[in-house]
Amino acid sequence: MTEDVKADAPKKLSIQRRTKTTVSSTTTGGKSKEVQVEVRKKRTVKTDIAQQEEAKLKAQQEAEAKKIAEQKAAEEKARLEAEKAATKKEADEKSKAEKAKAETAKPAKSAVDSKAKFVDPEKEKRKAEEAELRRKAEEVARQKAEEQARRAAEEAKRYAEADDSDNESSSEDYSDYNLSSRYALEAEDEEDRRNENRGRGKNKVAKAKKGGRDDENSKNSKNERESNRKNQKDAKFGKGKNGKKGTALQQAFTKPVQVVKADVVIGETITVAELANKMSVKATEIIKVMMKMGEMVTINQVIDQETAQLVAEELGHKVILRNENELEEAVLGDRDVNAEKVTRAPVVTIMGHVDHGKTSLLDYIRKAKVAAGEAGGITQHIGAYHVEMDDGKMITFLDTPGHAAFTSMRARGAKATDIVVLVVAADDGVMPQTIEAIQHAKAAGAPLVVAVNKIDKPEANPDRVEQELLQHDVISEKFGGDVQFVPVSAKKGTGVDDLLDAILLQSEVLELTAVKDGMASGVVIESYLDKGRGPVATILVQSGTLRKGDIVLCGFEYGRARAMRDENGKEVDEAGPSIPVELLGLSGVPAAGDEATVVRDEKKAREVALYRQGKFREVKLARQQKAKLENMFSNMSEGDVAELNVIVKADVQGSVEAIVQALNELSTNEVKVKVVGSGVGGITETDATLATASNAIIVGFNVRADATARRVIEAENIDLRYYSIIYELLNEIKAAMSGMLEPEFKQEIIGLAEVRDVFRHPKFGAIAGCMVTEGVVKRNNPIRVLRDNVVIFEGELESLRRFKDDVSEVRNGMECGIGVKNYNDVKVGDQIEVFEVVEVKRSI
């Protein structure tokens, strides 16, 4: 088309288009009227655009031809230069070779002249070597020239490809231009149509009668305009018809062939979400894996290190376990290691069944009346005392409770001890707590010395004790074993000296030593909260010397030793190995059994204590969440279970533990004891408020409520109980639980009547004439009708008469008329059994 356009052609070409149509319209009178409508369209085409396009295309072709010519010239030039260089190099080498040949020929000629043409083999060899060198040099020059020519050709090819891409882009621009010009023409046609429609719509009444046809036309034209505008815009930015970009503009990323397995660093505790984040997987994947392992978890649940390691290894990751207590190890490891060890006194724990005379024996040894001070003569917590012998030797005694509730306290006593003295009553023999004490001693690896107590009683039988202990692998020396049996009487003091000698002999065999001058370490035997002095801990020093002013790290607590007292309440400035002391100055009440260690830096001690608290909280939370999930379905199936809420306050930590454990063991399937709060020290207003909120009873063990707490307790009518003996506490809690049990109902037969005759009454139906053979027949009690000792009806009486009078009851041996409600099939020989439902109280 562009080639046919001549140079003298007009710049613009206008085309007129005229069409005539007839439109019939209805007038107001109902007659149809025909109107002649002439439509004129004018289109102008600019011819110079085609000329510009032709000129542009010609310029592009010329530029392309020029580039191709330049490329060929460059290739030819590079080839000629390479050939020229190779020829020049070859000529140079040839001239050099000829020159060398001429030089070598001169002496050869003179030699021939002088020696009658003698041929030298060395010269022949040199000639061959020179020829070889020349050939190699020519080969290298030729290869170099070929390489240069190849590079020049590649570069020319790259330029040609770049030119081709430029030509393609210019042709795309040209097609875009054609496309846009086509859209411009369509837009002009649309504008003409819109002007015609505007001219037609002058008569508004007629437009209204058409029912909105023009509105639809205008809507359609508007949609078309928007569509055209969008298409034009998309064409400009290289998009397709549906608005999506072409594939040439899209970036594609290849999916990795396999998942990258990273190293996972796991601390002591971690949540499921954190573990998923570290492994770059979804949390649901971890939950699925743990469900396969039999564990139900949530996304925010804390799991321990071992579980997290199993999950990570299951998913194919390498696990790095991180030890979070590095600071703790560093602080505890900073000790005096080169200090000299010396012989120390033995720590002896006296264990045995309740009321077998442990405290009385220790009392006689200490020469002080302690047993009278204990409530009911029962030891409620560990007492620690040290006794000095006549020869200057010292023994430290720990007195543990014998009651079943104090198992954990006995276990602590056995762990802190060197020798266990097992007290067995000669008249009572081996009892449950005796067996338990033997097990604790074996678990702690402490040797036993058996004290057979109460030998002064007439019914005492020490031989029976030895026989019974044989069944529990406690073999006396008499039977070839290594356990010393010493008969004693705590009341009269018989055999006590022999017992002390046996203890010292056993300690010499053990060769007990400890560092005396280093930093102290020990174990908390007992702890409590004193109202005036604050937290008090009874610490048994095991190595080193504990001095006043030392910084002590004790479980979750820390502090400076402000004051120390011995078992008699006397102030002391230091305590060496095997000496028990009461320590004041800790930040809180430590748990009995915690290790007490002297450290150098108070700041680091605080950091370690806070770290331990946080770790304990996380582990406790993880355990609670696990228990909640595990018990969820069982709790749903159990339904409502009665709960007895209790708040426990005691004088020492060990007693709190023992009472809470004993109360939890009292729980049954119907009534559960829930300890909502426990602590060491007096009963405060906070405890009373908690009891009000949780509807709990407050149990005080060797403690009392202060004035503010008493006011709240009286105002809210809270049940407050004080105890000093654990037997009474447990029995009363059992009674309270029994009151919460659902009552049982029992049926008791109170009377029996035999049917002798049956009368028919028009109003009451069948009336049984009966003789009361047993008990009393009562009018308002339920009855059963028996025939041949088989119950055939159960209901109630409608009437009970004696002669013509209505009566409430008829006694044994009397006749009466009985009408059974809703039952008329009474026969002679039947028995009418009268019973009552009695409530039976249950107990635990």
UniProtKB/Swiss-Prot annotation:
<feature type="region of interest" description="G4">
    <location>
        <begin position="453"/>
        <end position="456"/>
    </location>
</feature>
<feature type="region of interest" description="G2">
    <location>
        <begin position="377"/>
        <end position="381"/>
    </location>
</feature>
<dbReference type="InterPro" id="IPR013575">
    <property type="entry name" value="IF2_assoc_dom_bac"/>
</dbReference>
<keyword id="KW-0342">GTP-binding</keyword>
<feature type="region of interest" description="G3">
    <location>
        <begin position="399"/>
        <end position="402"/>
    </location>
</feature>
<feature type="region of interest" description="G5">
    <location>
        <begin position="489"/>
        <end position="491"/>
    </location>
</feature>
<dbReference type="Pfam" id="PF22042">
    <property type="entry name" value="EF-G_D2"/>
</dbReference>
<feature type="compositionally biased region" description="Low complexity">
    <location>
        <begin position="21"/>
        <end position="30"/>
    </location>
</feature>
<feature type="binding site">
    <location>
        <begin position="352"/>
        <end position="359"/>
    </location>
    <ligand>
        <name>GTP</name>
    </ligand>
</feature>
<dbReference type="Pfam" id="PF03144">
    <property type="entry name" value="GTP_EFTU_D2"/>
</dbReference>
<feature type="region of interest" description="Disordered">
    <location>
        <begin position="79"/>
        <end position="249"/>
    </location>
</feature>
<dbReference type="InterPro" id="IPR023115">
    <property type="entry name" value="TIF_IF2_dom3"/>
</dbReference>
<dbReference type="InterPro" id="IPR053905">
    <property type="entry name" value="EF-G-like_DII"/>
</dbReference>
<feature type="domain" description="tr-type G">
    <location>
        <begin position="343"/>
        <end position="513"/>
    </location>
</feature>
<keyword id="KW-0547">Nucleotide-binding</keyword>
<feature type="binding site">
    <location>
        <begin position="453"/>
        <end position="456"/>
    </location>
    <ligand>
        <name>GTP</name>
    </ligand>
</feature>
<dbReference type="GO" id="GO:0003924">
    <property type="term" value="F:GTPase activity"/>
</dbReference>
<dbReference type="Pfam" id="PF04760">
    <property type="entry name" value="IF2_N"/>
</dbReference>
<dbReference type="Pfam" id="PF08364">
    <property type="entry name" value="IF2_assoc"/>
</dbReference>
<dbReference type="InterPro" id="IPR009000">
    <property type="entry name" value="Transl_B-barrel_sf"/>
</dbReference>
<feature type="compositionally biased region" description="Basic and acidic residues">
    <location>
        <begin position="211"/>
        <end position="237"/>
    </location>
</feature>
<feature type="binding site">
    <location>
        <begin position="399"/>
        <end position="403"/>
    </location>
    <ligand>
        <name>GTP</name>
    </ligand>
</feature>
<feature type="region of interest" description="G1">
    <location>
        <begin position="352"/>
        <end position="359"/>
    </location>
</feature>
<feature type="compositionally biased region" description="Basic residues">
    <location>
        <begin position="200"/>
        <end position="210"/>
    </location>
</feature>
<feature type="compositionally biased region" description="Acidic residues">
    <location>
        <begin position="162"/>
        <end position="175"/>
    </location>
</feature>
<dbReference type="InterPro" id="IPR036925">
    <property type="entry name" value="TIF_IF2_dom3_sf"/>
</dbReference>
<comment type="function">
    <text>One of the essential components for the initiation of protein synthesis. Protects formylmethionyl-tRNA from spontaneous hydrolysis and promotes its binding to the 30S ribosomal subunits. Also involved in the hydrolysis of GTP during the formation of the 70S ribosomal complex.</text>
</comment>
<dbReference type="InterPro" id="IPR044145">
    <property type="entry name" value="IF2_II"/>
</dbReference>
<dbReference type="InterPro" id="IPR005225">
    <property type="entry name" value="Small_GTP-bd"/>
</dbReference>
<feature type="region of interest" description="Disordered">
    <location>
        <begin position="1"/>
        <end position="48"/>
    </location>
</feature>
<dbReference type="InterPro" id="IPR027417">
    <property type="entry name" value="P-loop_NTPase"/>
</dbReference>
<dbReference type="InterPro" id="IPR015760">
    <property type="entry name" value="TIF_IF2"/>
</dbReference>
<dbReference type="GO" id="GO:0003743">
    <property type="term" value="F:translation initiation factor activity"/>
</dbReference>
<dbReference type="InterPro" id="IPR004161">
    <property type="entry name" value="EFTu-like_2"/>
</dbReference>
<keyword id="KW-0396">Initiation factor</keyword>
<dbReference type="Pfam" id="PF00009">
    <property type="entry name" value="GTP_EFTU"/>
</dbReference>
<keyword id="KW-0648">Protein biosynthesis</keyword>
<dbReference type="InterPro" id="IPR000795">
    <property type="entry name" value="T_Tr_GTP-bd_dom"/>
</dbReference>
<dbReference type="InterPro" id="IPR006847">
    <property type="entry name" value="IF2_N"/>
</dbReference>
<dbReference type="GO" id="GO:0005525">
    <property type="term" value="F:GTP binding"/>
</dbReference>
<feature type="compositionally biased region" description="Basic and acidic residues">
    <location>
        <begin position="79"/>
        <end position="161"/>
    </location>
</feature>
<dbReference type="GO" id="GO:0097216">
    <property type="term" value="F:guanosine tetraphosphate binding"/>
</dbReference>
